Amino acid sequence: MIITSIPDFSLQYDEPLGLLRVEWASGDDMRTFRDSAAKLLLLVRELGVRHMLLNMNTLPDISVYDQVWMGTRWMPHMAKSSLERLVLVIHRRRVHNQLAIDSLIAAARPLIHFDIQYFPQPGPGLHWLSDYSVRLPALLAEWEALHSPNAATPPSANERSPFYRAGH
């Protein structure tokens, strides 16, 4: 299910998997980042999200002020959420955000009770989060239909990942 309640984010939720996919959708405009991040936290709580993918590749460089806010206001609440697993998608060339995220996680590590994994692309991260669920191709198709310039034939919906195990 595509969620449109937070305009700064592209959001997709699958209730049976307890999986929320999150991507920044406002380009370089970070003026409403804090408000949207706070709304995201409320959504995670409201839905009882267990597995979340945050695509950090779509987020501009996080300012020092936003990093401090996240570390003091946002991370402590996220650490108390229902999350069991978190995937952070970040390309190795996104050094600024990689360092910012590493710093935030290090500071909040004593509070965090969920598994955190890094992936360079969303596909493998979604496979891991969903335990290679048979629901994943439909979720990928739904996402591609919304985000792909060629929505008629979503390429990744029918492709099997090298990590895919049939029957799960």
Give short role names for the model-derived ranges.
Residues M1-H168:
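Amphipathic, Lys/Arg-enriched alpha-helical "gate/interface" segment within cytosolic domains
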